[in-house]
Amino acid sequence: MGLREETAEKHRIAEQKEFNQRMFRGELTKEEYVNYLTQQSLIFNQIEFGNNLPSDSLRRSEKITEDLKELKEQENYIVLPSTIEYVNYISNLTEEQLLPHIYLNYLALAYGGQMMKSKVPGSGRMYDFDNMMECVGSIRAVQKDEWSEEVNKGFDFLIEIFDGLQNTTGPNGK
């Protein structure tokens, strides 16, 4: 089986998390989306800090910062324990070991993010890629089926993050 098939179950679970579903339906408040962006900022800053990406046009940190500046009204942001765990985990990986997490996080923005951009508060700069095909191609060029275990670990972290974000919003998402 290939990478896509080996990670399909975790991908499905992550997509079906209530917070993620609410984001796809355009139901997040500005505060909830800012909390999501805060987690994304920490993850992408760690991935990009001192690491070579398959393409420089993949870089998201500055765009996430622009989104946060646009939406920022609150001073206290939630940083989830699961986000700290994921950031700590990826901080201990070599550049080669980090590639499955680049695959997971950047392709999620490249594909799912294009549907999400019109549903979230603000401009959604995080989802803007200067050359989408080149960005996706740069990841596909280094992609390996052997990444499935590591991609599934990344999904486990993201599933926990989605659960944590949902738990900060209350049982009905408000």
Task: Tell what function each PLM region has.
Residues 1-174:
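Metal- and O2-centered redox machinery and metal/ROS homeostasis
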